[in-house]
Design a protein with these regions (language model features):
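Membrane-embedded helix-loop-helix hairpins and adjacent transmembrane boundary segments
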Residues: 1-476
Length: 476
């Protein structure tokens, strides 16, 4: 009975927040970055909620259990990417406060072509990230309505539709309000999970616990592994260390009212995310001690079934659903903004763009629901989606933030090269590794080589092609 009460209360609070937020959405700028009057607490909660994510919990659960420190250490590197943003990027965002999207920032420096390319890459990559969040609803729904024997696909459609609706009408203000509710629910749920599992492990006789092989959770397991596994470990560490330059993260950097607020919010978020990662790892470690022979498909059911007190199971499920909804609505909001504000409708009025953004929220939400049925592994789907944004946009975006004076054609050339490389790796030669890091490296090499050889040295002037570098310096 308590489970039903908690589910109903959670949905009711969300609906109320959505209705209240939707009343004050007047144009695309408010839809994208709100009125920029968010408190540091609100900004911190939405950063944490977006970065934790429901899919992140499932990935942490399966990968920590299966790989131990081989996944925990790279996951901790993800936390330090937020610290990097706080220390080195936030203080450089003053010229871009209030910008509606990452594409608007790129277009401001590099031109409209780069703005459109960034918007398309961002929307495509974000669609995959939304699908990752939607996918976990298939598992969660069975614990809410499992007695009715409903096809899991309907859970994806149901929750995906709810998120699509409230993101479409409420804009980022609705996203921020629900993020706070969802983050609080998640923190409560993981505290309860630790207490329940700790008591369960404490009841197991010591002679049984001593026989459990926990070598994968020891640091020496990394140095005693095969070279291929160590190489993949290093690549994953570097990948997670990349600063959070996805469209939703940039949105969190532009909606602040001052750079000091941004630095504080991202630093606190770093600490909270680190606590969450370590806490989730401890939950998995306790789960492993209770049963070290679980299959991947048995992990979450075993965790859920550990909670025998009425209402406790609902709190954990609500916490995970909250994180999935929080991340999905953030990416859904920014993807609609990218298309409405930065592609074909960029010359329309701000009110017209708002209408277009809401329509695209529906289209992207439906597309993400469809995409969930094509890939099963969450980490694989996450990396696949990111491979069409991170290698293409991150390098020129960081160059812009750190005030490198690059020209439009150099950026287009580097973006096109990395995009072709990713497509070849995915669809032609089918490499066994994720091409994100090699593609980023290729992007950087092409970008700065073309800048220093073609633009700065003007070697192409012999062919009648002149450098635009002087124009950029003059305009700045």
């Amino acid at each position: 009975m308590l489970d039903i009460i908690f589910y109903s209360a959670f949905v009711s609070v969300l609906i109320y927040s959505i209705i209240e937020s939707a009343k004050f959405i007047e144009n695309i700028n408010i839809f994208a970055v709100g009125r920029r009057n968010f408190s540091t607490f609100s900004l911190t909660m939405t950063i944490v909620a977006t970065w934790v994510s429901g899919s992140g919990f499932f990935i942490n659960l399966t990968q920590f259990y299966k790989s131990g420190l081989f996944y925990l250490i790279p996951a901790i590197f993800m936390c330090f990417s937020l610290l990097f943003v706080s220390l080195f990027i936030a203080k450089r965002m003053k010229p871009y406060l209030g910008f509606s999207s990452v594409a608007a920032i790129m277009g401001h420096r590099y031109g409209h072509k780069i703005r459109v390319i960034t918007a398309i890459a961002g929307a495509v990559g974000v669609m995959g990230l939304i699908a990752v969040q939607f996918k976990i609803f298939a598992s969660l729904g069975s614990y809410i309505w499992g007695e009715y024997n409903i096809n899991p696909s309907w859970y994806v459609i149901f929750f995906g539709s709810i998120i699509t609706l409230y993101s479409s009408f409420g804009g980022v203000q609705s996203v921020i309000k629900t993020d706070i509710i969802q983050a609080v629910c998640f923190f409560i749920s993981i505290i309860i999970a630790i207490v329940v599992l700790y008591l369960k492990v404490d009841s197991i006789p010591q002679e049984i616990l001593s026989k459990v092989d926990v070598s994968k959770f020891h640091i020496k397991s990394i140095f005693q592994s095969e070279s291929d596994k160590i190489w993949n470990f290093i690549l994953l560490c570097v990948y997670f260390l990349i600063p959070g330059m996805n469209p939703a993260s940039i949105q969190r950097l532009t909606m602040g009212f001052h750079v000091d607020q941004l630095r504080s919010s991202w630093f606190i978020s770093f600490l909270l995310l680190l606590i969450v990662k370590l806490t989730c790892a401890y939950i998995v470690y306790l789960l492993y001690l209770t049963n070290p022979n679980l299959q991947e498909s048995q992990l979450f059911p075993t965790l859920i079934n550990s909670f025998e007190i009425d209402g406790v199971k609902a709190i954990l499920i609500i916490g995970i659903i909250s994180m999935a909804m929080s991340t999905a609505d953030s990416f859904l909001n920014i993807s609609a903004v990218l298309i409405a504000n930065d592609t074909y409708a960029y010359k329309q009025s701000s009110v017209k763009k708002l209408s277009i953004a809401r329509k695209w929220s529906f289209i992207i939400g439906i597309s993400a629901i469809i995409l969930t049925f094509f890939k099963n592994d969450l980490l694989s789907l996450l990396l696949f989606a990111n491979s069409f944004y991170i290698p293409i946009v991150t390098v020129p975006l960081l160059a812009l933030i750190f005030n490198f004076k690059l020209t439009e054609r150099c950026v287009i050339f580097s973006m096109a090269t990395s995009f072709i490389f990713v497509c070849v790796c995915h669809f032609i030669i089918h490499v066994s590794f994720e091409p994100i890091m090699p593609a980023m490296l290729l992007n950087a090499v092409v970008l700065f080589t073309s800048h220093y050889i073609i633009e700065k040295w003007e070697l192409l002037s012999r062919f009648g092609i002149t450098s635009n570098l002087y124009k950029i310096r003059k305009s700045n």
